[in-house]
Amino acid sequence: MKLSLSPPPYADAPVVVLISGLGGSGSYWLPQLAVLDQEYQVVCYDQRGTGNNPDTLAEDYSIAQMAAELHQALVAAGIERYAVIGHALGALVGMQLALDYPASVTVLVSVNGWLRINAHTRRCFQVREQLLHSGGAQAWVEAQPLFLYPADWMAARAPRLEAEDALALAHFQGKNNLLRRLNALKRADFSRHADRIRCPVQIICASDDLLVPSACSSELHAALPDSQKMVMRYGGHACNVTAPETFNALLLNGLASLLHHREAAL
């Protein structure tokens, strides 16, 4: 699996791995790259079955497989210890990495994540699946911003959204791969295992997230033994894109604090 690695800003700089959500594209993290590159060696990638890592996914594809293939790619690149920043599905992959490779994951950041899928989130995906089946990739892509962004943010950026739709349609991961990745997301349940995650965790959520209620992050915070939660008042599901200055400040401060906490505990 292909990874994109930034040059380390200094010798032995900590490594940060960015894991996007269901879309799978590493470019989702573009608003964070410039600030993270100054302090960390940053790893981005398109998830298997998407972008520049094309593949046909098995029907039983799982979050555990997503975690294993990423860890193997990191080890092959000479990276054995790393912090993880995951958005939605990416946060699930991050938790799986923390469970399966505890010696490797130094810190986990969960952005609009959850322990197990909420009934409201499931309903949103059911509607989106119906759109995919009835209207194809174009209907899926055109509906997606409604679940990602606040209404006023979208209304002020109509040309940008049109360009994003065209790009997403041109690089659509394929119906079968999308549904198999979505099914992996829906099957994931960390409610009985979260207390085994021992690395420090930063939880960031947006109170106006339409897709994933912020209560999901509260449940995550209660279940994780070493976690702290930050709530953004504005930003929607893709709050790192719509409110990058607020998000980046929370992320950088949290990462630095938790990495220091981790090193002090060793």
From Swiss-Prot:
GO molecular function: hydrolase activity, acting on carbon-nitrogen (but not peptide) bonds, in linear amides
Lineage top rank: taxon: Bacteria
EC category: hydrolase
AB hydrolase-1 domain location: 14-116
Disulphide bonds in the chain: none
GO biological process: nitrogen utilization; uracil catabolic process
Annotated InterPro entries: AB_hydrolase_1 (IPR000073), AB_hydrolase_fold (IPR029058), AB_hydrolase_sf (IPR050266), Pyrimidine_utilisation_RutD (IPR019913)
Transmembrane listed as a keyword: no
Keywords recorded for this protein, A-Z: Hydrolase
Catalysed reaction, written as an equation: carbamate + 2 H(+) = NH4(+) + CO2
NCBIfam families reported in the protein's UniProt record: RutD
HAMAP family per the UniProt record, alphabetical: RutD (MF_00832)
Protein role: Involved in pyrimidine catabolism. May facilitate the hydrolysis of carbamate, a reaction that can also occur spontaneously.
Record's protein name: Putative carbamate hydrolase RutD
